[in-house]
Amino acid sequence: VTRRFVEAYTRQVYDWCQAHDLAYTGHYNAEDSLWSQIRWIGAAMPHYPYMHIPGIDKLGRQINTAAGTVLTVKQLDSVVCQWGKPRALCENYGCGGQDFAHTGRKWIGDWAYVLGVNLNNPHLSLYSMRGERKRDYPQDIFYQQPWWPENRLIADYFARLSYVLSQGQRVVDVLVIHPIGSAWTLYRPGAARDVEQL
């Protein structure tokens, strides 16, 4: 299933972007647990080699939970290291709420960077917050926020950190076998517990 998805979609988008001097980036849906990967994308890691800047999504105001686990970041980091990719992107702060300001953003961003991310992609900048837009997985990071005039403080911090962390070459001497194959053998629709215990 995963191989077919990669060949029928991810690799074709990657090849098209490559042929047109574009960088394919973004994240796949439901990459945050083994169970959700099987249900939505088969497995996250096989897609990442066919992205110029592979990425993940870190939702909410918490770390190390189902909505943003260490597993998610380390899967990305592993492929970036193995394939020599220069960047590991994380879309941060979605579903954090409109009142999620600098200290929370720094905490979440630093957590992701410690685990291997080196490109911060803040979630959502709306030109207008009319209608349903103000409720679209906030936070909106733009002029509508009362702290917008000071946003440069955190933006510059992550820009500098991203640059520094993208300049070196990491030496990784630890091998961890990823459990997605075992997860597939335990998978049963509607029964997440066995898979999530891995």
Task: Go through each PLM region and give its residues.
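Carbohydrate-binding surfaces of carbohydrate-active enzymes
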Residues: 1-198
